[in-house]
Amino acid sequence: IDCTGNALIASMAGYDVLREEDTQPGSLIFRLGGYKYDELDLTKIPKKHHRILRQNMLENSKRESREHTYVPYSYVYVPGADSTTSEGHTIANNEGRNTLLNLVRKLKTFPGCENLKLVDLKTETAVRETYRIDGLYKMNKDDYTSGKVFDDAVSHSFYPIDLHRDGKSIYQEFLKPDIVASIPLRSLIPKRSQNFLVAGRCVSSDRLANSALRVQASCMGMGQAAAVAAVLASKQGISPAEVDINEIKNLLKKHGAIIPKQV
């Protein structure tokens, strides 16, 4: 089961993988402290920095230290972030940290931010998009936003279409009320494969569907479904695609998974 997020094992095994010519930027997530947003004179701070300082400063999500209010989190973009090689991942991490360091230094020059400090940051740059498998079925954006329930659906996804196009604009399309996307087992199986599955960001899907499928909860659901399919296939001596879908769903349900409508 390839859970690399980059379809690395699928590629090494000789299965076809797909990638966009231009991929979405990555993000380095961090938290700031040492200032009070409500006391800042925003007229003296360039507008482009307001988002970083304001991020998630809602009354019900404030986190209080003994001295200052911490921003729950914010992020900087890392264009071209790539985690498919050690070299690329290192470059993305270094670029993210350099961008963040320059930002912190700049923010500290503004009135009210003299004591601003970096509280913490993620250990690595988060990568949104690399390779996807060419699976038995490629989920598309309409499948996702319509909440189509596939006959071989094994898990759900909830996130909106969320394509970070160039680091400056985001295309989003939220699911309508009572619509929940489902993920078919076929999208976890590479074409021409026998005893192989994937789970996570490298699921077989078009770019827009993948922009929603890539998040953690969806990946966890795919991982559990792929594991169950693999166990049943191994016990029965057949390929994952040949396992009865109701057996997969029953075992998932036994272990507490939230599964799409029973066939």
List the model feature ranges, each with a label.
Residues 4-263:
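Flavin (FAD/FMN)-binding glycine-rich loop and adjacent Rossmann-like elements that form
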